[in-house]
Structures are given as C-alpha cells and as structure tokens.
Amino acid sequence: MVEPLLCGIVLGLIPITLAGLFVAAYQQYKRGKELGV
C-alpha cells in the first residue's frame, strides 16, 4: 500500500523540481543580462 503514496509524492515533486530549475535559470539569465554578459 506504499506504492500509490510514493507515486503521488514523485508526481508531486517532479513539477515542483522543474519549476524550481526554471526559476533558478531565469534569475541567472536575468542577472547575467544586467551585468552585460
């Protein structure tokens, strides 16, 4: 009975992880643009 819970956790974490990576990349890009790189 643990597998459905694990599946839910994984399915919940994947979008959060992708969103976090996207935000981090966007902030880095914006900061680089401000520095004129």
From Swiss-Prot:
Transmembrane segments: 5-25
Signal sequence annotation: none
Subcellular location(s) of the protein: Cellular thylakoid membrane
The entry's keywords: Electron transport, Membrane, Photosynthesis, Thylakoid, Transmembrane, Transmembrane helix, Transport
Gene Ontology biological process: cytochrome complex assembly; photosynthesis
Main subcellular location of this protein, as a coarse class: membrane
Molecular function terms from GO: electron transporter, transferring electrons within cytochrome b6/f complex of photosystem II activity
Record keyword Ribosomal protein present: no
InterPro entries linked to this entry: Cyt_6/f_cplx_su5 (IPR003683), Cyt_6/f_cplx_su5_sf (IPR036099)
GO cellular component: cytochrome b6f complex; plasma membrane-derived thylakoid membrane
Topological type in the membrane: Single-pass membrane protein
Domain of life: Bacteria
Complex and partners: The 4 large subunits of the cytochrome b6-f complex are cytochrome b6, subunit IV (17 kDa polypeptide, PetD), cytochrome f and the Rieske protein, while the 4 small subunits are PetG, PetL, PetM and PetN. The complex functions as a dimer.
Function of the protein: Component of the cytochrome b6-f complex, which mediates electron transfer between photosystem II (PSII) and photosystem I (PSI), cyclic electron flow around PSI, and state transitions. PetG is required for either the stability or assembly of the cytochrome b6-f complex.
NCBIfam families assigned: PRK00665.1
HAMAP family recorded: Cytb6_f_PetG
Family according to the record: Belongs to the PetG family.
Protein name per its UniProtKB record: Cytochrome b6-f complex subunit 5
Lineage: Bacteria, Bacillati, Cyanobacteriota, Cyanophyceae, Gomontiellales
Gene (UniProt): petG
